[in-house]
Amino acid sequence: MRFQQRRNYSSHTDAELARAFRVLAHPLRISALRAFAVSDEPLAAGDVAFMERDEIPAPTVRHHLQLLAEAGLLRAVGPRSRGAPGRPAHRYVLTDLGTDVLELLHTAAATSTPRRSARSV
């Protein structure tokens, strides 16, 4: 099967794409990136829906969001006042790289067919 490029991803270097895909090796980070893709507003760790559903502690979610930001998939837009003492919650938005990587993942998933292992033939 030949890959048909629908968008121009040349604005991203191979190193940027490799770093982005490497950080997405954790399923929680893919879930987080998807949450940002459907949000119209910046999100903080406590805003990410799977955190409550899966009972993932906020510090763990913050760590994963920070890794996504370091890989260039998210961009911090500043702290949000929580109205309570303590560390302010950082809010993030999806970057162009994050959007493009999600589109590449979606395209790959939509066009891939399950492979049978050589042992099952």
Can you say where each PLM-predicted feature lies in the sequence?
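N-terminal helix-turn-helix DNA-binding core of bacterial DNA-binding proteins
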Residues: 16-56
